[in-house]
């Protein structure tokens, strides 16, 4: 069924979907990792593809920037296309000294400054956590490949351009490994919809060290994260 934001037909998506924020990253994954990949949606230049990875049917669909955008696509994929498992593959910032650019972080749970979860959870705090078994699959996938990962909590923010030293100090004190703009919202919606979800991000910005990844690398130099995620999706199907 065509939705206001996705023009794929029923059955065009696998029940397992990788979701980067960047449409160009979705295209990169489809071209470089999936066999016989076809474009199944392109409304508003939000690209989605379905193909085969090691014989298994996998889809990749971009979700845009921020909680509101990402929740639109997650909701429609689950409600209209019967998606059961989603891995968000993105980039994130950090304020943790031992974390560096290009390091990979698997997110266990995410706090947020967004009002979205409170609006949906009757003004109460919602515990936004990943699916345990999908986290375990990501961990085992990385371990099998010998790829170093970090596992910990995220802070999801509505504001990309903001200077708040007190907040950064708090994130350090609570050992918040990653800062992004989507995970807390995606985790809460996945809980409501009853699907498996996890978020894995490559560090693109170190806020304290004032170091950042180039825009080219943000599109295409995330191969370890992509490989871990694809392997995790098929781990129990082998």
UniProtKB/Swiss-Prot annotation:
InterPro entries: DeoD-type, Nucleoside_phosphorylase_CS, Nucleoside_phosphorylase_d, Nucleoside_phosphorylase_sf. A purine D-ribonucleoside binds at residues 5, 180-182, 204-205. CDD domains: PNP_EcPNPI-like. SUPFAM superfamilies: Purine and uridine phosphorylases (SSF53167). The record marks 218 as: Important for catalytic activity. It comes from the Bacteria. Its EC number is 2.4.2.1. GO terms for cellular component: cytosol. One of its GO terms (molecular function) is purine-nucleoside phosphorylase activity. It catalyses: a purine D-ribonucleoside + phosphate = a purine nucleobase + alpha-D-ribose 1-phosphate; a purine 2'-deoxy-D-ribonucleoside + phosphate = a purine nucleobase + 2-deoxy-alpha-D-ribose 1-phosphate. The keyword Protein biosynthesis does not apply. The active site is at 205 (proton donor). Disulfide bonds: none annotated. Phosphate binds at residues 21, 25, 44, 88-91. GO terms for biological process: purine nucleoside catabolic process. Keywords: Glycosyltransferase, Transferase. Belongs to the PNP/UDP phosphorylase family. PANTHER family: FI09636P-RELATED, URIDINE PHOSPHORYLASE. Homohexamer; trimer of homodimers. Catalyzes the reversible phosphorolytic breakdown of the N-glycosidic bond in the beta-(deoxy)ribonucleoside molecules, with the formation of the corresponding free purine bases and pentose-1-phosphate. This is Purine nucleoside phosphorylase DeoD-type. The lineage of its organism: Bacteria, Pseudomonadati, Pseudomonadota, Gammaproteobacteria, Enterobacterales.
């Amino acid at each position: 069924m065509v939705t206001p934001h996705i023009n794929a037909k029923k059955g065009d998506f696998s029940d397992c979907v990788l979701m980067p924020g960047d449409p160009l990253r979705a295209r990169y994954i489809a071209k470089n990792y999936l066999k016989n990949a076809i474009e199944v949606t392109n409304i508003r230049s939000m690209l989605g593809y379905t193909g085969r990875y090691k014989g298994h049917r996998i889809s990749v669909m971009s979700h845009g920037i921020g909680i509101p955008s990402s929740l639109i696509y997650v909701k429609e994929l689950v409600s209209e296309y019967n998606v059961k498992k989603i891995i968000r593959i993105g980039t994130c910032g950090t304020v943790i000294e031992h974390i560096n650019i290009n390091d990979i972080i698997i997110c266990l749970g995410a706090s947020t400054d967004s009002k979205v979860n409170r609006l949906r959870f009757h003004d109460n705090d919602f515990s936004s956590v990943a699916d345990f078994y999908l986290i375990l699959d990501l961990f085992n996938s990385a371990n099998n490949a010998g790829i170093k990962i970090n596992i910990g909590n995220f802070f999801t923010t509505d504001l990309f351009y903001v200077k708040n030293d007190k907040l950064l100090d708090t994130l350090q004190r609570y050992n918040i490994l990653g800062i992004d703009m989507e995970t807390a919202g995606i985790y809460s919606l996945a809980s409501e919809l009853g699907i498996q979800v996890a978020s894995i991000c490559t560090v693109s910005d170190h806020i304290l060290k004032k170091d950042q990844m180039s825009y080219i690398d943000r599109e295409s130099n995330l191969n370890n994260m992509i490989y871990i995620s694809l392997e995790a999706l098929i781990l129990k199907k082998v």
